[in-house]
């Protein structure tokens, strides 16, 4: 079991690294279909933020919730959410968006709620 947790920890930190890479790359390198990007709604752009932060929060809390320092993970993800949006101000082809921050926070809260409910359910069994 410890090996699985260790592997999940590596996956968690790799996912953060991957997210950071996506945010620092110019938009032209990421978006292959430029016409689809132009016609994208705010919801279509921000939903990816919701999914990714739900995933990151769920994975991080699942791995670290048994440890007493899980609040550090919560704080790290909150800072990461704000930091990656601020980076958009300086990366060519990227834009700062309050909707993306909202989607990050909602994804973060959803992941937190999901893991909290799963942990309560597991404790009952």
Short names for language-model regions:
Residues 1-101, 105-125:
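Bulky hydrophobic segments
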């Amino acid at each position: 079991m410890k090996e699985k947790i260790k592997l999940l920890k590596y996956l968690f930190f790799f996912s953060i690294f991957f997210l950071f890479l996506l945010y620092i790359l110019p938009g032209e390198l990421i978006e292959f279909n430029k016409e689809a990007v132009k016609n994208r709604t705010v919801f279509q752009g921000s939903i990816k933020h919701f999914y990714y932060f739900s995933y990151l929060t769920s994975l991080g809390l699942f791995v670290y919730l048994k440890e007493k320092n899980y609040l550090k993970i919560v704080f790290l993800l909150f800072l990461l959410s704000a930091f990656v949006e601020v980076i958009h101000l300086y990366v060519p082809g990227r834009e700062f968006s309050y909707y993306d921050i909202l989607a990050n926070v909602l994804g973060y809260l959803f992941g937190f709620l999901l893991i909290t409910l799963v942990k309560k359910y597991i404790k009952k069994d």
